[in-house]
């Protein structure tokens, strides 16, 4: 096991072979990397019951330090995150959505806002919200060094024909900057959990996973509660589970891969995209904290209006056809995945026959 120790403390202790130093025991390594600490491996350690109120830690370990077990941590990397927001007539929620991003403590990101032919004022409100953010940034502008000039954070793309969320996200890929490392999806009626959401994401990206599954919360009747924390142990559990687009951060090269693009012109577009992403990923990590808030109070959301939306029934049929196509594409490559897709085909076919949707 590897744990962290402050470098200055090490310098004090290493001259005395009999000297012990206290080490953080239950802090994630990713959290400590940002502090530019060093770490060491240990063999014989004992628990020390002491309350370190300054660090909010109740239990720490102590260990003898030697030069042999001294290891330097890898450099902390600030990955650029491309946040994709599809929008259609969400003038009442888009400001809250964008504000939750602009207030982030982690700032190495860009937003691709793709409007799917809205007829309301959502584009105007998005521009006004961004302008308000820019004015705040300019208030801290350093006229001498010019080091504080805010970078462009928001790109607005207006579609010329209706493509729904899947098409909007595919279009967004074409507008991502070349230096974007990962993509994350935020719906225009939802928002990020708190101001450290992107910081938490970047800490977990230090191991360079293809996919990072994140925790979700839901907002309903004025209350926010945690509703989904990923617990996948392997690729098969991830495929068999279901994480909507907003439940994962994906390496840009994987998300934009031809085989992993969204189906367009249909609802439920993220179900098969999830399967494809999980099939082609080589590694993943879990962030067992809420990062995203799913707004279940929104009367216009897809899942809320599914019973009266004429697209819902046709999308169930389309989903069955897309699942069949996915099964035929992947069949024979992995026996466990074959069985999962076969059972999924049966389930979706039953949905078509019963005009229902058991997944919801």
Placement of each model-derived feature along the sequence:
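Non-catalytic, C-terminal membrane-associated alpha-helical segments of glycosyltransferases
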Residues: 338-360
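Acidic, serine/threonine- and proline-rich low-complexity regulatory regions
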Residues: 331-339
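Nucleotide-sugar donor-binding/catalytic module of glycosyltransferases
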Residues: 1-10, 17-46, 52-318, 329-332
């Amino acid at each position: 096991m590897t744990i962290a120790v402050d470098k200055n403390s090490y310098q004090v202790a290493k001259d005395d072979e009999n000297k012990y130093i206290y080490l953080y025991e239950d802090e994630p390594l990713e959290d400590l990397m940002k502090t530019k600490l060093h770490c060491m491996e240990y063999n014989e350690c004992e628990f020390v019951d002491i309350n370190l109120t300054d660090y909010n830690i109740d239990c720490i370990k102590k260990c003898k330090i030697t030069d042999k077990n001294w290891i330097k941590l890898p450099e902390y990397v600030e990955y650029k995150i491309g946040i994709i927001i599809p929008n259609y007539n969400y003038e009442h929620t888009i400001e809250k959505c964008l504000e939750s991003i602009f207030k982030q403590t982690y700032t190495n990101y860009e937003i691709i806002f793709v409007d799917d032919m809205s007829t309301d004022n959502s584009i105007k409100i998005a521009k006004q919200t961004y302008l308000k953010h820019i004015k705040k940034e300019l208030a801290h502008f350093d006229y001498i060094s010019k080091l504080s000039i805010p970078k462009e954070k928001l790109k607005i793309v207006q579609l010329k024909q209706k493509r729904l969320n899947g098409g909007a996200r595919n279009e967004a890929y074409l507008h991502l900057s070349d230096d974007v490392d990962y993509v994350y999806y935020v719906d225009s009626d939802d928002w990020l959990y708190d101001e450290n959401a992107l910081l938490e994401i970047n800490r977990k990206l230090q191991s360079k996973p293809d996919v990072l599954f994140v925790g979700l919360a839901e907002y309903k009747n004025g209350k926010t509660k945690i509703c989904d924390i990923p617990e996948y142990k392997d690729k098969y559990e991830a495929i068999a589970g279901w994480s909507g687009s907003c439940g994962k951060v994906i390496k840009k090269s994987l998300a934009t891969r031809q085989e992993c693009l969204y189906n367009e012109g249909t609802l439920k577009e993220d179900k098969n995209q999830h399967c494809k992403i999980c099939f082609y990923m080589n590694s993943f990590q879990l962030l067992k904290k809420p990062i995203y808030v799913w707004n279940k109070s929104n009367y216009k959301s897809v899942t809320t209006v599914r019973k009266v939306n004429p697209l819902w029934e046709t999308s169930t049929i389309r989903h069955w056809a897309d699942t069949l196509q996915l099964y035929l594409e992947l069949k024979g490559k992995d026996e466990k995945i074959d069985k999962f897709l076969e059972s999924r085909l049966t389930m979706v076919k039953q949905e078509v026959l019963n005009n229902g949707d058991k997944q919801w």
